[in-house]
């Protein structure tokens, strides 16, 4: 048992490298070994332990960067670094362990491999909503490096793509058990499935060239270090950096700043004066991330993470409040039990908003606004977006430096564009900022920690809603049925050939 434990930990660590920015796809084969070990376990407790150890390694290498965010204010939160580095993998590993336990109980089933894949995706889905949810680094994102491979998201969503990836990745497991007839069936089924999604993706990209609206946007990326983001001494420097990057003689319709670009209320007279000076200079509307409150005091006071639009005459065209808040970052869960303050600036917890669409009548533009990690929740993005024209995602990933985190966040976010057939304008404080078309193609972008701006036209959305945007995760049944049918027919053909 000792050697399997060590190998599970090492292979789990390796498997976490299948995501951005490394996309080490050969590491997906580690899942075949896990699938084999679960089937050969002597009891469910052993399967649980092996799955847990693999899962711990998987999440440790995949989301290690969260501890970097905690270390930004190391003098206040030094004690939280080990909890961020090890605590989250310790918790998330239970989901891998649970999928292995359930799979163990069907280890003798003819379709054990197929059921193993189902349980893996089922517990990815559970992970996406339980305890507020964290659907980060779902295994389907291993394919997000390729425009072609992610096109099926418009039908089956990320959980459907996860099923494809886990199925292909574990199809080598009969090699370890010397079940070579089954190995032939699984490899052939995987090859057919991969060929189908490659063909579908290629044809879809060819048949849908990018079309553009006439709305021109300017994405501003100041790359302000997180240690200076909320500094009173740096406030005016940071504001003027935003303004200087936004000013240009080229005509523009919308200037877009990142999450918390304004760290004070916009209507402070001296701040508002600078903003209106900019907007009149460029003759444009500003969309920015900022903070907002309900103008009440005492126990009724509420603070929001916001996105709002300002006209050059000072009118606020819309205000959106973030509804998926980051636990421990923007609010403290179990506050009565845990006597700690949140990791972000200030002592007051942020309050949840209501979500939904916002409108810019002047441009006849309906926007699905997303702040920060709201973009990682497929169902949240899909909800109430039937009439949306564009997704605008503002975020601040400066917490995580040059780690894997900002790259993973970018690829996760652009997957929402493909799922919903909507273009995305993504503006990040330190990158990666980009204009993305409804098929996930990156039209223009600013790299991590680049200080610059880009101008571009907003791409048009697709002519009709995607299957996923209409029906949601129920569409995963399509790919499950397809793969099962191919598997069954090939298996039956193999049996008949023996007879």
Swiss-Prot record:
Any one GO CC term of the record: plasma membrane
Active site, UniProt feature: 259, 322, 372
One Pfam family this sequence matches: CN_hydrolase
GO BP, one annotated term: lipoprotein biosynthetic process
Coiled coil: none
Compartments it resides in: Cell inner membrane
Name used for this protein in its record: Apolipoprotein N-acyltransferase
